[in-house]
């Protein structure tokens, strides 16, 4: 991932004001669906790739995981994780996903939330996860939806009055680097098609269990201004897969 944008103090301060930073998993619009894709975590060894504040790590412990390892390349993220989501069963490691070494056939469950669109080589990640999982181990992750990442800027098209017209989808089949604006900063992401996400998992030996394009929960649609616009295009893609014996 290179230099981590989240270690920029100004950017990190803005991120810390987001709902999912303040309220944790309950502040994430996809959580009500994402959590249902997790297997039973009791007694399991769990790895969280790109753990951020450690919300998913703490959730795993609260659901009786045996041990949890959280990986993140941002020192500031891990500092916050150790502050608000620390536990004797959780080990936080400062490393990029590309460089971290995962012990072979060790973990029962690998999870990742909204990270892989920052990584260029999804194939290498899948191979690493597959090797690190035990037989019948589960890989559950979320990414920004390819429709959301395709054009790059990640902004609605609006008319002269400022009213939203549509979401632009362009260069969908041209995968690779995109420059978007997130929290007022230029952020580099890597667009991949839906086919790439699915077929890469299959090629690496995974069995696809479930693919979901989540909608915000009813209460968010009713209570948060502008949230109903999220029904006009998918923002996220959730996938669960299993390592076949």
Please report, for each region that a protein language model flagged, where it lies by residue.
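A short acidic, Gly/Pro-enriched loop at the edge of an enzyme's catalytic core
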Residues: 98-110
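Short alpha-helix
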Residues: 176-177, 188-211
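A short SAM/SAH-binding and catalytic strip from SAM-dependent methyltransferases
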Residues: 108-122
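Class I SAM-dependent methyltransferase SAM/SAH-binding core
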Residues: 47-49, 53-99
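A short glycine-rich, Lys/Arg-flanked "PGG" loop and its adjoining helix->strand segment in the class I
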Residues: 123-138
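C-terminal lobe and adjacent flexible extensions of AdoMet/dcAdoMet transferase-like proteins
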Residues: 200-245
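Conserved class I S-adenosyl-L-methionine
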Residues: 1-41, 55-59, 80, 139-175
């Amino acid at each position: 991932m290179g230099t981590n944008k989240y270690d920029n103090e100004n950017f990190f301060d803005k991120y810390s004001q987001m709902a999912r930073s303040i309220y944790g998993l309950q502040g994430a619009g996809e959580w009500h669906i994402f959590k249902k894709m997790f297997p039973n975590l009791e007694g399991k060894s769990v790895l969280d790739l790109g753990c951020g504040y450690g919300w998913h790590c703490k959730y795993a412990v609260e659901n009786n995981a045996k041990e949890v390892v959280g990986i993140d390349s941002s020192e500031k993220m891990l500092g916050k994780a150790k502050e608000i989501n620390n536990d004797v069963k959780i080990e936080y490691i400062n490393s990029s996903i590309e460089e971290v070494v995962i012990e072979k056939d060790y973990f029962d469950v690998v999870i990742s939330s909204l990270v892989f669109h920052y990584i260029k080589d999804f194939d290498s990640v899948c191979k690493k996860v597959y090797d690190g999982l035990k037989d019948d181990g589960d890989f559950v992750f979320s990414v920004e939806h390819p429709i959301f990442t395709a054009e790059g800027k990640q902004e609605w098209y609006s008319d002269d009055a400022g009213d939203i017209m549509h979401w632009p989808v362009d260069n969908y089949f041209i995968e690779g680097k995109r420059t978007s604006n997130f929290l007022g900063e230029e952020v580099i992401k890597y667009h991949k098609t839906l086919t790439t996400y699915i077929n890469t998992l299959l090629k690496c030996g995974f069995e696809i269990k479930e693919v979901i394009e989540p909608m915000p929960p009813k209460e968010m649609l009713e209570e948060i201004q502008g949230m109903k616009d999220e029904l006009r295009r998918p923002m996220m893609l959730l996938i669960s897969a299993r390592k076949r014996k």
